[in-house]
Amino acid sequence: MPDFFSFINSVLWGSVMIYLLFGAGCWFTFRTGFVQFRYIRQFGKSLKNSIHPQPGGLTSFQSLCTSLAARVGSGNLAGVALAITAGGPGAVFWMWVAAFIGMATSFAECSLAQLYKERDVNGQFRGGPAWYMARGLGMRWMGVLFAVFLLIAYGIIFSGVQANAVDRALSFSFDFPPLVTGIILAVFTLLAITRGLHGVARLMQGFVPLMAIIWVLTSLVICVMNIGQLPHVIWSIFESAFGWQEAAGGAAGYTLSQAITNGFQRSMFSNEAGMGSTPNAAAAAASWPPHPAAQGIVQMIGIFIDTLVICTASAMLILLAGNGTTYMPLEGIQLIQKAMRVLMGSWGAEFVTLVVILFAFSSIVANYIYAENNLFFLRLNNPKAIWCLRICTFATVIGGTLLSLPLMWQLADIIMACMAITNLTAILLLSPVVHTIASDYLRQRKLGVRPVFDPLRYPDIGRQLSPDAWDDVSQE
């Protein structure tokens, strides 16, 4: 069975997903007028605006922190380690490329989610890919298919991957029994997810910035302490990225392929651009300024923080400790722990264990919120179905600590590809709407006015929207 999963992965990620992700990212980069570069100077202002509370939804900052909670998981640690193990230091460069290109894709999917959001019976905004497939494309069957993929991925598999990383870290540092790890983590997860969307969002708006700052500051201090090695480490990333070192031996093509494949895979698992997960958090926000593009820009910040800051920090630690080769026999998170033990002394591995627990716990909780959101689309938002999902998440967390690492990542990669193919197909079909959103936002910015989305200006789009999602805005 592992060989079968490996074969499926090689087909999907050997060519299909790489071309699709790269092509979609380039398309939306051009279609939105290089949105990730145009508004990069606005990131600070967008973060400031994101704190404004608005009726009917989360603040944009709460939405960002919820999406970051899902993004900033073991993929930022174990995923980076796996990418370097399989693809060499050059995988880091391709993670950067995937992140920059993915920012445009994320802008597209999150803007669409914000545009096609609707209110539930409690007045809370709900939305995501399933909604824009149903409303924007008129293909509810496609939305149902995506929602099922997401429930499998975020309700089951991805939480198991995060739990697996926690177990690996605790086993390496303290020889902790896997079953005990799983039960404790599952209990804390259950306590958190019963708080609901608003409760989780309030928890994450304080929790996520704190854990990210701890990891990044620690990494910066270590980099400064080893500043003499940094030029060599940075050069090794670029040298390996293009196969220059292996060219003389005739292995450049294979090495380049491995670097690109693993860089794109791990970047996507970490920042989730194009996968269709982040739009579930983006749609829950009452955006400020009241324009879909504003939420798209805020969520681009999440990719910048996740991959270009946190993942890069993890990569630097691994490469500083062993130039990407010394500890290759170790798997995933244990490679990071060994690197930190080399760089920080005996307590380095224990510090990584703490960080992994924080990252993985926040990710599991946010994963559940995404899955629960799609129960609403499937009209299964009754107490029985919700508690069934909670129990399933509880069991998956325990099970994740007992399964092997390669199997967990193979399953994650396959379901991630299924989600991405469905979502990317939808947003590419909706690219004229994305272009309209980006152009409308830019037009108002050039006029020097606060961007406000008015559905009456675009009647073809307005007819597709939920009646009460943008009514207040159009009346301003």
Language-model segments: which ranges?
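N-terminal alpha-helical transmembrane segments of multi-pass membrane transport
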Residues: 1-74, 84-91, 102, 398, ...
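Extracellular loop-to-transmembrane helix junctions
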Residues: 6-42, 85-123, 305-313, 349, ...
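Transmembrane helix-loop junctions in multi-pass membrane proteins
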Residues: 17, 31-36, 75-80, 89, ...
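Membrane-interface loop-to-helix entry segments
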Residues: 20-27, 31-44, 164-170, 176-238, ...
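Extracellular/periplasmic helix-exit of transmembrane alpha-helices
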Residues: 29, 107-117, 220-236, 244, ...
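Flexible loop linkers connecting adjacent transmembrane helices
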Residues: 34-59, 82-92, 96, 104-137, ...
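Alpha-helical membrane segments and immediately flanking helix-loop junctions
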Residues: 54-85, 112-130, 134, 151, ...
